[in-house]
Amino acid sequence: VPSSAGISSTVVNDTIVIPYNSPEALERVLKSREVACFIVEPVMENIGICLSDEGYLQQVREITQRYGTLLIFDEVKTGITASWGGATGAVGVTPDLVALAKSIGGGLPLGAFGGKQELMDLITEGKVVHLGTYNGNPLCMAAAKAVLSEVCTPATTDLTIARNTLLVNAVSEIINDASLPAHVVKFGAKGCVTWAEKQIRNYRDYKATDFDLAFAQWIHGINRGVLLPPGLDEQWLISVMHTDADALHYADVFDAFVQELTA
């Protein structure tokens, strides 16, 4: 499934796309050839929010271990928005490597990765080169330290997730009362309205959702002070600065949209 122009044949030849939530597809690929690593979002968040099936990630962990393939969690989108331990902590599956960004920087540009000792030793021993002009940038490092120790503490993170649950429940009730072909998906402090009756399980499911209604909802919200990201593939995020009233304001605006939609 192409995502952008400009993807070279070399990248295509070195990459195998495996459908999310399909351990059978993963097993077929790893059984047929040698694969260095399997990179997966524990919860997909560039298609709204696509949750993993029950037991899927546990199966992925078992399959990759059996075939000697590294398991890498892409937590650029999830991170501490999922829980203080990230999506890795929330789902209870430990990968070999994890990539982080966005939320850990507190608004400053920051990316990080970490993993098992034997893998990180490849860098410290000079066997794998890891260079970057802004690696270890003091300003970004100070911000990350403050975020993780002073701002997004375990208690504060739990509070934002509880506040998101308040919003999710309110929006779900509106959808159910109006019998709309939509549903709400929640993970940690994030949520979204997906305009489809059934929960999506992969990228192809997401492409079949109603983007016209999603765009109409976005425009309606923008004109009433609800500033969601412009990409229809994004989510809302409850931050430590939001209050219960802020969360329920979104629900009120969504309710107004539904009233206009069904009038």
Predicted regions and their residues:
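Conserved N-terminal phosphate-binding loop of PLP-dependent enzymes in the Aspartate aminotransferase
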Residues: V1-A263
